[in-house]
């Protein structure tokens, strides 16, 4: 009995001391104790939703008049409404605050205030996510990773939506729904289905190039901090002299790109589905602030007329030797969010959020994105989503009124129509804005050369090719035969060597799967479960 009392006393002393002694806790693990350390006393009286202080006798409702207990009514009536619609894509995510600092003079290319003035700092909020994972899914899926950056500039919010590979899957916005459906859960089984995945890839071979990037070492970066990110679209920039430039932005991690193999990701995933999220939070909480260099690949209007490829095609890379690269500045994340729902779940990023000097992309996919991103945010957050604190620009005066809260000051008593003669907000004339608009005519034809080039030149060595082929084989095993045959044909058309090696690996994997199905329980100990390209386990023999 004395031992038990002593043990309890020790625990109380440990907690009350607010010290960590010789135990090293990660910032993620010590969050609650850190809060207590910064608030030695309770932060105030608990109140009901309307502000009335809570009497301690109302905190227990057994054998009481529950009908008149407003605290109970507040609790029951609000808990069911704590969730908002989950994002259809990029649902599993995290984020942080930081700043962007201009390190190089790029006034030659754009008059955008955010990128002009060496040393200028602009606050940012960044959201990272996995492309097709649900909110409770795995960070370690072989999946597209995203990095959305919101710059709070003096001229409005600038949103750069980036992905972890430098090419996008398609260029026709009409395909957005179908690829989302095919890459998400099957409507009957509610499971990720590689048959639908490869079915749409073989019927729309334009997807092949981005698929190759995902099946390579670039498919699972070693956390968000060690990941490059690419806004993908070709942006039009305008200088103060009326000159136009066409650029592709790149965020290059200053830690250097690092990847996880499928086996490494499987080992981590068995212990921690939130590996990327934990790594980012702990790094910032420990003062190891992640950072990226922002640069842009540049083509002038004159250069544009000489290239022998479509520089606006988001499914392909620009050819080496046709452009030059210009550094702009550094993105640094130095502050974790205080409330995930407020700062990450409610954050709304829109490729249509641009600023003077950056007219933005001119391709058709970008035009489509500006529509469906806005529609998504209206559905998830309401039509006043830009009045939620994390989305609010530094300066805003509009003729938008009312609607579902938040409305904030709702422009108070200012005129609510334009034009008016009573001193409501007025527009200005942007003298530097280009007078002419570039019109890009695109084709729905696809070219297999980018995928061929990736296999032969971007995969830098034989070891990388072997991992790439193994990842493809792993995802083909559960696919039904007719679709597998089309996939094999497509791979053969891209590169004969690739097709033959994938076919050979596929046959070996099928044999291993059959052997496992026929094995005794003791024999199955030589097999283990590893995640597929989407982070969902399938059987294969131990590769060690």
Please give the residue ranges for each predicted region.
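Extended low-complexity, proline/serine/acidic/glycine-rich cytosolic segments
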Residues: 8-10
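Active-site-adjacent core segments of small-molecule enzymes
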Residues: 2-4, 15-544
